[in-house]
Amino acid sequence: ASMLVGCGGNNEKVTAKVIDIDLTNEEYAFGVDKEQPELLDEVNDFIASIKEDGTLDEICNKYFSDGEPEAVKSAKLDTTKDQLVVATNAAFEPFEYTKGEDYYGIDMEIAKLLADELGKELVIENMDFDAVCLSVSQQKCDIAMAGLTINEEREEYVTFTDSYYSASQRLIVPSNVTTFDD
């Protein structure tokens, strides 16, 4: 998976190369309400299952290759129903984003499959990123699914599941650059 960012003002055609050194390594996981250890176990079992059977790779390939992303619908929150309430910030494509009323992204497709597996109706609560883990810790949502990097600060609010995605950052430079001084 890659994302390119660049700047420049001339029309000179320049080729680029990737420096094959990971600058950062991050593990993404979901954050579960600390008061729901059984949900944590169910989510970890689910992650293991979709890794093993290839479902996770299929979902990722939709967003990093030429696949067709699937729209995910959210039900309305209703405390009388058996629902899985997901906290997200749908502004981190390809993990979560919106088009109209529909949600898309790796995390959102996983959320739909997880809700189906648990026999629950899916509710997606879209909020500011800083509120995602907090809303789970306050039992307003069951699980945080927002392209979350595992870190100590967030662990104060949620219990992280097993990792489902590894990310790294690399430099992309003009192909004629041969040293870091360039």
What residue ranges belong to the model's regions?
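Extracytoplasmic small-molecule ligand-binding "clamshell" domains
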Residues: Y28, E38-E42, F46, I50-E58, ...
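Short aromatic/hydrophobic contact patches that present stacked aromatics
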Residues: A29-G31, R170
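A short, acidic/glycine-rich surface segment
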Residues: E70, P94-Y97, E152-Y157
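Long, compositionally biased eukaryotic signaling regions
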Residues: S74-A75
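Bacterial signal peptide processing site
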Residues: G8-N10
